[in-house]
Amino acid sequence: MHFSIPETESRSGDSGGSAYVAYNIHVNGVLHCRVRYSQLLGLHEQLRKEYGANVLPAFPPKKLFSLTPAEVEQRREQLEKYMQAVRQDPLLGSSETFNSFLRRAQQETQQVPTEEVSLEVLLSNGQKVLVNVLTSDQTEDVLEAVAAKLDLPDDLIGYFSLFLVREKEDGAFSFVRKLQEFELPYVSVTSLRSQEYKIVLRKSYWDSAYDDDVMENRVGLNLLYAQTVSDIERGWILVTKEQHRQLKSLQEKVSKKEFLRLAQTLRHYGYLRFDACVADFPEKDCPVVVSAGNSELSLQLRLPGQQLREGSFRVTRMRCWRVTSSVPLPSGSTSSPGRGRGEVRLELAFEYLMSKDRLQWVTITSPQAIMMSICLQSMVDELMVKKSGGSIRKMLRRRVGGTLRRSDSQQAVKSPPLLESPDATRESMVKLSSKLSAVSLRGIGSPSTDASASDVHGNFAFEGIGDEDL
């Protein structure tokens, strides 16, 4: 997650108290909470008490006198670095002390009282699930409530996550972010003050081998089936006409497991697709559509001749990655109308091992760059867990009154309608040469053999590679 403190505000104290400086903490470019220096100092002291001073990053010291504007700016920069360092630390960033501080601050900033509400959560096929939660319930609480409503077993809850999405005019979802443990889902979605934003339940893992665990349960099977049918209908999963015919036949027979087994062999099964954006590969300002899955980033692009191409970057070939944000300045008459100082430009850049001795930076410019980075990190985490022989199955950390809250009534996952005929305008992708030759490339109907991806966040899954592997 991308933490920043891009601005400060001078605010009046409660009941006519003295004015103070508030620091606006943004997560992924959106205001999360507004806090005072004293609140952050209290957080720092609590973390120091629990973990020791040696573990913590430097915290800006107290000042005896009022700060000048220059000193306020300096403190803002120092607090921003502090919050980023704490969040990036595996111990501190996942601590309940840090996360509960952010949850309380979010609720206080949005001035949302603690009360019971009905929250709408969508399944991948658009089916609505209404759950009764508290406005102060954190992400895991809401996920448990949804699982209870669907009668999903406790040991399968960790295979699914809640995502904040924006519903576009055509009904498609544009993914904003995966909801995290430091936020309150009800507050997160309502604070955006737009009916376009929704919360969606979707599987949270990338390796299709984990499907076997989920498919053994009736509810888990139905959730995977509904998500897969939806992804095919949206064109996220790439199918040929013959594959589509086979899938429809299995769907008519209600052979859900066999349907999923066939879908697992298809290109882009289980991938998350992003909105159209721009990359500097294979050439500058190249329009692309990015998808993440199967330990890779896939870039679909159209080169001269209007042929649709695909390049795949394996996460194990990415040495590191970074997300940067900037505010472009208008350049006289050449700047487009409405494009000004307030528009934030986000970029995901990763250093990719093109050949044994050649690393190259690839940059993707997209409002969803942070979400792409989160996907890369989760793919790396999953690879490392699998490499160490661990399991992604998560045990629930908390219980309410010793047991999970269960809804009085369960809700079944509705079977989606039969697949429609494949879009005749969909084009097959052909392999590229020259500049793209070092990247794994496929046509739509070709077998899913090699996959390629890249990363710059200090990638522990980065592997050495020889020319013969490319």
UniProtKB/Swiss-Prot annotation:
Matching InterPro entries: PH-like_dom_sf, PX_dom, PX_dom_sf, RA_dom, SNX17-31_FERM_F1, SNX17-31_FERM_F2, SNX17/31_FERM, SNX17_FERM-like_dom
GO CC terms, sorted: cytoplasmic vesicle; cytosol; early endosome; endosome; endosome membrane; Golgi apparatus; intracellular membrane-bounded organelle; membrane
PX domain boundaries: 1-109
Gene3D superfamilies: 1.20.80.60, Phosphatidylinositol 3-kinase Catalytic Subunit, Chain A, domain 1 (3.10.20.90), Phox-like domain (3.30.1520.10), Pleckstrin-homology domain (PH domain)/Phosphotyrosine-binding domain (PTB) (2.30.29.30)
Region described as Disordered: spans on this chain: 401-426
Protein name: Sorting nexin-17
Keyword Ribosomal protein: no
Keyword Protein transport: yes
Record-annotated Ras-associating domain positions: 115-206
PROSITE patterns: PX, RA
Molecular function GO terms recorded: low-density lipoprotein particle receptor binding; phosphatidylinositol binding; signaling receptor binding
Stated family: Belongs to the sorting nexin family.
Subunit-structure text: Monomer. Interacts with APP (via cytoplasmic YXNPXY motif). Interacts with KIF1B. Interacts with the C-termini of P-selectin, PTC, LDLR, VLDLR, LRP1 and LRP8. Interacts with KRIT1 (via N-terminus). Interacts with HRAS. Interacts with ITGB1 and ITGB5 (via NPxY motif). Interacts with CCDC22 and CCDC93; the interaction associates SNX17 with the CCC complex. Interacts (via C-terminus) with VPS26C and VPS35L; the interactions are direct and associate SNX17 with the retriever complex.
Impact reported for residue 440 to D: No effect on interaction with CCDC22, CCDC93, VPS26C and VPS35L
The entry's keywords: Cytoplasm, Cytoplasmic vesicle, Endosome, Lipid-binding, Membrane, Phosphoprotein, Protein transport, Transport
